[in-house]
């Protein structure tokens, strides 16, 4: 039980974790909490003689508090503090390998979920963070005072590059700011990435010339190797595209951070899709909450990330969703358990990420979405644009008109 230290005073530089743990029957909570702290830091299953060659007091994780979860039988929140020295600077990969790498398969636990992490400024300052952030993006696009509008091109698979470009053009001409590759559009036999990039670029510039607005399409650079991913991002930049896209969980944090550095150095915005997140965050008592994945993404680098909708076809509770939306956008977020925020998080000067509301939303949801997400967001309507009975461009017009109306009503102080 050397890892259970209820009298420990946490330091400003400690990385703090809140685990929701369900011990096996007969295992005391303190023992389970100590086991989590040990296995995710310096411990192993037995005492080893080489422990004497280092200072465990300096390097060990400490379980410093355990509280039972109200209304749940045999479930606890265990708070663990990790010394900063345990982690490589600027590596989300290393952070996750340490904290969630091994401990989730632990025999003494029936289930374990990482609910939240407190990242101290001493650590967060070693990360690149979003390549550009919210303000720089608005300046690049010269679009202010309203949410941005996007649309995922459907059917997501099976279109030829030529027809894909046509769909993009229709949407952008109608008034959307962005269109998007679906997360699983990479480079398949029916549409190789280069053909898609070329026909999309043509559509972009045509729509820009017609509307006088800057347009973007999230060109998905996700690939089977980092080298191939960079090749696609470089080609997108050469075409003059303003934004590329990456699936950060399937692509991996290492690839994601490499891409973020490239995007910052070359003036590309980076849109992040969270494909595979529900595998990790859907279970209520095992895995990892999305707010942890959102914090990790803000450090690893991305200018947009999908963040649920509160009103569409995918799961998400309003307060909890708003909790991690604030964690993405704001500099300083107060601890608030009702919104699932277990720790006060101070991002200091790290730029914010724009949350993207996407998944089963349509024009009818517009008042709710403008109210819930506010101006710094991207509202993404896939079927909600392309499903318009008159076609893509009228669908885009409908969305833009609805958005402008809601923003005007809000600015006049009317209740949405």
From Swiss-Prot:
Q: Where is the active site?
A: 154 (proton acceptor), 273 (proton acceptor)
Alphabetical list of InterPro entries matching this protein: RuBisCO, RuBisCo_large_chain_AS, RuBisCO_lsu_C, RuBisCO_lsu_C_sf, RuBisCO_lsu_fd_N, RuBisCO_lsu_N_sf
Domain of life of the organism encoding this protein: Eukaryota
Q: Which GO terms describe its cellular component?
A: chloroplast
Which reaction is the catalytic activity of this chain?
A: 2 (2R)-3-phosphoglycerate + 2 H(+) = D-ribulose 1,5-bisphosphate + CO2 + H2O; D-ribulose 1,5-bisphosphate + O2 = 2-phosphoglycolate + (2R)-3-phosphoglycerate + 2 H(+)
> Which GO molecular function annotations are given, in alphabetical order?
magnesium ion binding; monooxygenase activity; ribulose-bisphosphate carboxylase activity
Its annotated compartments are:
Plastid, Chloroplast
Q: List residues binding Mg(2+).
A: 180, 182-183
Q: Does the keyword Disulfide bond apply?
A: yes
Membrane-spanning ranges: none
Q: What is this protein called?
A: Ribulose bisphosphate carboxylase large chain
């Amino acid at each position: 039980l050397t890892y259970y230290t209820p009298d420990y005073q946490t330091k400003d530089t400690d990385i703090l974790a809140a685990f929701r743990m369900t011990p096996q029957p007969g295992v005391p909570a303190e023992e389970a909490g100590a086991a989590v702290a040990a296995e995710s830091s310096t411990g192993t299953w037995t005492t080893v003689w080489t422990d004497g060659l280092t200072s465990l007091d300096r390097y060990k994780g400490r379980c410093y508090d355990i509280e039972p979860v109200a209304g749940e039988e045999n479930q606890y929140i265990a708070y663990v503090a990790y010394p900063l020295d345990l982690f490589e600077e600027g590596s989300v990969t290393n952070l996750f390998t340490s904290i969630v790498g091994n401990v989730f398969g632990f025999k003494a636990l029936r289930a374990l979920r990482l609910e939240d992490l407190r990242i101290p400024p001493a650590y967060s300052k070693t990360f690149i963070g979003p390549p550009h952030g919210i303000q720089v993006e608005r300046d690049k696009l010269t679009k202010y005072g309203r949410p941005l509008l996007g649309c995922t091109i459907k059917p997501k698979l099976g279109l030829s590059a030529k027809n894909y470009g046509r769909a993009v053009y229709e949407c952008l001409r109608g008034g959307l700011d962005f269109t998007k590759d679906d997360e699983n559009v990479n480079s398949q036999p029916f549409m190789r990435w280069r053909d898609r990039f070329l026909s999309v670029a043509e559509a972009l510039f045509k729509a820009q010339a017609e509307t006088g607005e800057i347009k973007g399409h999230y060109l998905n650079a996700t690939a089977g190797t980092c080298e191939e991913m960079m090749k696609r991002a470089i080609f997108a930049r050469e075409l003059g595209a303003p934004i590329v896209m990456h699936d950060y969980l399937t692509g991996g944090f290492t690839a994601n951070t490499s891409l973020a550095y490239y995007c910052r150095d070359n003036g590309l915005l980076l849109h992040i899709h969270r494909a595979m997140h529900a595998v990790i965050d859907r279970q209520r008592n095992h895995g990892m909450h999305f707010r942890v994945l959102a914090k990790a993404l803000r450090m690893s680098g991305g200018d947009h990330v999908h963040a649920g909708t509160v009103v569409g076809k995918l799961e998400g509770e309003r307060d909890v969703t708003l909790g991690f939306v604030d964690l993405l956008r704001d500099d300083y977020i107060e601890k608030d358990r009702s919104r699932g925020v277990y720790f006060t998080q101070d991002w200091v000067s790290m730029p914010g990420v724009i949350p993207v509301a996407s998944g089963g939303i349509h024009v009818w949801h517009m008042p709710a979405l403008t109210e819930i997400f506010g101006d710094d967001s991207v509202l993404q309507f896939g079927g909600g644009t392309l499903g318009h009975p008159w076609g893509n461009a009228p669908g885009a017009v409908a969305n833009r008109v609805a958005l402008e109306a809601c923003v005007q009503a809000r600015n006049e102080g009317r209740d949405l």
